[in-house]
Amino acid sequence: MTISTRKIEELFKNSISVKEDCIEKGFSSIVAMGVEITRSIESNGKIMLCGNGGSAADAQHLAAEMLIRLRPHNNREGIAAISLAQDTSTITACGNDFGYDVLYERVLRALGRSGDCLIGITTSGNSKNVILAMKAAKELNIKVFGFLGCGGGEALKYCDEAFIVPSDDTGRIQEAHITAGHALMEYVEDRLIESGYLNLL
C-alpha cells in the first residue's frame, strides 16, 4: 500500500470513527429538531439555513433537498426552505455596505416570521454572522437549531436544540453534518407525508 493510499484509508477510517462517536451520543437532538420543523411547516412556517464556506454549501444543499426532494421514490410537494447563503448580490452588498458579520441577521430580520425555524451550521460554533442570526431569531420567536462541532462554541448558548459533532477536525465535522442533515430531512419528509400535509405527486 502506498503512502497516499494509506492516507486516504486513514481519512475514511477517521470519518467512520467520528460517525460512530455520534451514534454513541445518540440522536435525540435530531428527533427534537424534526418534531419542531414538522410543526412549523404544518403551520405554514419555513426553514432558513445559514453557514460559511463548506457550511454555506451544506445550507444550500439541504434547502434544495427540502424544496425539491431528497429520495427519488418520494416525488412529493416542496417543503418551504431557504438558504440565506445563496444570493451573491445580497452577500456582497451587505459585506460592502454593512460588513459580513451582520449578513444573516439582516436577511433573517427581513424574511423571518414567528414560528419559522433557523438552522445555523458552524463547525467551530463561533461564526459571528451565524451567532448574530441566532440572536435575532430568538428575538423574533423563531426556533434556533445548530449543527455544530468543537464542543458547540458560543453558538450553543442560542440553540433550542443542537447536534454537536464530537470532533475538532473541520472536514470530519462537515461530513457528519451532512449525514445528520439528511437524517433530519428524511424524518421531516416522512412525518409530513404520514400526516397528509405533503402529497405525493
Per-range role (PLM):
Residues L118, V144, E161-F163:
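Short, well-ordered beta-strand core segments
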